A protein has these predicted regions:
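Extracytoplasmic/secreted cell-surface and envelope-processing proteins
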Residues: 17-22, 58-61, 96-97
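Substrate-gating cap/lid alpha-helix
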Residues: 58-90
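Conserved catalytic region of serine esterases and O-acyltransferases that act on ester linkages
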Residues: 82, 102-206
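Mature catalytic domains of secreted/periplasmic carbohydrate-active enzymes
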Residues: 1, 26-28, 118, 122-123
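Proline-aspartate-enriched helix->loop->beta-strand connector
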Residues: 1-14
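Structural beta-sheet core signal
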Residues: 10, 50-51
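A short helix->loop->beta-strand "cap" motif at the edges of active sites that frequently abuts
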Residues: 39-47, 84
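Glycine-rich anion/phosphate-binding loops
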Residues: 23-35
Length: 206
């Protein structure tokens, strides 16, 4: 209600199975939750894009929790037939992980098997880029150009996230965010810097 987004990208699943073997009741709750989220988003005039959960890669001798994520992902992908917009992270990450491990058996996208690191997030973000049919420049012709770009993007995201979490009274343990007005001012300055860096990269790529 406070943000009034026009586009929502939602990724649920990795915590929804609560790290236990597949359970039909939990699975139905997951499906019901996403269907209700979609209905509420569209009722407010927002478009919604779902992403399948990323790979779970933490060994467990008792059962393979990633099989639960696979089931959740397959259901989400099946909803494309009902005109749901779905970006598949799970199968892409699983295939890439297997490919990487043919050369390095110890390769990981995530240190804890749950939260992807930089390379994992890069692969995930590329699937979003592919969904929107945006072709990024292939080479970084300017030293640290992408690094500077990412720095400004992260700062814009961080300050707005913390401001809104504080504004809506979220109970998440965190430092108090800035006011919305202060955050928007900082975000606007970062947007200018982001655009400047993008223009530099694009010019160098032509």
């Amino acid at each position: 209600k406070a943000l009034k987004p026009d586009l929502i990208i939602a990724c649920y699943g990795i915590n929804c199975g609560i790290y236990k073997p597949f359970d039909e009741e939990r699975f139905n709750s997951y499906k019901d939750g996403l269907q209700r989220l979609k209905a509420k988003a569209e009722a407010k005039g927002a478009k919604i894009i779902f992403m399948t959960p990323p790979v779970y890669d933490k060994p467990n001798p008792k059962f393979n929790y990633d099989d639960v994520m696979k089931a959740y992902s397959e259901w989400l992908i099946s909803k494309r037939k009902d005109s749901w917009k779905v970006i598949d992270l799970h199968s892409v990450m699983k295939k890439k992980l297997a490919d990487k491990r043919t050369k390095n058996p110890n390769f990981k996208y995530s240190r804890d098997g749950i939260h992807p690191g930089t390379e994992g997030h890069e692969l995930m973000s590329q699937q979003i880029i592919n969904f929107f049919a945006v072709k990024p420049p292939l080479k970084d012709h300017q030293p640290n150009a992408y690094g500077r770009l990412l720095m400004f993007i992260r700062e814009r995201m961080r300050v707005q996230r913390d401001a809104w979490l504080t504004e809506i009274g979220h109970k998440r343990p965190m430092k108090k965010g800035k006011t919305i007005a202060e955050a928007n001012k900082i975000a606007a300055n970062n947007t200018v810097r982001i655009q400047q860096n993008l223009e530099t990269i694009l010019k160098a790529s032509n």
